[in-house]
Design a protein with these regions (language model features):
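A helix-coil-helix interface module used to build multimeric assemblies
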Residues: 1-188, 193-200
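Acidic, glycine-rich loop-and-beta core segments that form the ion-binding/anion-interacting portion
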Residues: 202-251
Length: 251
């Protein structure tokens, strides 16, 4: 059952987001009077050391002990600064909100990378279409020559598809980039923690206002996957056209 319940070998991908969220949480608990300045400083510096271990590839996962990325980071923090102070990090926080926060931050960060790649790709398409506007080629329907077209016209037909993908991606990112931190297990936080401050520190654009929905919903993951399927459908068409056009019969 221990091995069955472990998710550390999957959610360790969230290590940076988990640590950033924990630092923001500790800062908010310090502001709320739960942690002293010295305790917050120790927790912050300890978590920064844990992040350096992950970055250097020296963090040691302990099978059977580190159930998930949250327990792994907190276990290591306690080893570095002592369990008495390290154990205070989790005061008032639930892993329900913690994993939802990690997932949203990680997904947002990865989608923004794709956003950059897709924007660059669109610029290349536009530049090539402008440069090669005088190239003429056969236009095909059902693999039969139908009408003469410009190479740039073909290029920009995919440019429109990818531009729509980019627009939809930005809409997905906007819905992903909302903070559940401070929502507790399902009914909020009893210590009047500053959710706005934490959201701003972690780069969220706003808050999820219903605590039960915030910690239980995973529709943002499904929406990102749906978007990715649409993008790959366009990429597949693009690739298939290029494969077909490499044969002399089609040029």
């Amino acid at each position: 059952m221990v091995s069955y319940n472990e998710s550390i070998y999957y959610d360790r991908a969230f290590h940076s987001q988990d640590i950033a969220g924990s630092i923001a949480w500790a800062r908010a608990n310090h502001k709320g009077g739960i942690l002293s300045a010295a305790e917050f400083s120790a927790i912050e510096s300890g978590l920064e050391k844990v992040e350096k271990e992950w970055a250097a590839g020296t963090f040691k996962i302990i099978p059977g002990v580190d159930e998930d990325i949250h327990t792994a980071n907190e276990r290591r923090l306690g080893e570095l600064i002592g369990k008495e102070i390290g154990g205070k990090l989790h005061t008032g926080r639930s892993r329900n909100e913690q994993v939802a926060t990690d997932m949203r931050m990680w997904l947002r960060d990865e989608l923004r990378k794709i956003e950059t790649y897709l924007s660059d790709f669109l610029r290349v398409i536009a530049a090539r279409a402008e440069k090669e506007v005088d190239y003429v080629m056969p236009g095909y329907t059902h693999l039969q020559r139908a009408q003469p077209i410009r190479w740039s016209h073909w290029m920009l037909s995919y440019g429109m598809a990818f531009a729509s993908d980019l627009e939809r991606l930005r809409e997905v990112i906007a819905r992903v980039n909302l903070s559940p931190l401070g929502c507790g297990a399902l009914a909020g936080n009893p210590f009047n923690i500053d959710r706005q401050m934490m959201a701003k520190e972690l780069g969220f654009e706003g808050l999820l206002w219903n605590s039960m929905a915030a910690v239980s919903s995973r529709d943002f993951v499904v929406e990102a996957l749906q978007w990715g399927a649409t993008l790959m459908g366009h990429m597949s068409r693009w690739a298939e056209d290029l494969i077909i056009y490499r044969y002399f019969l089609f040029l």
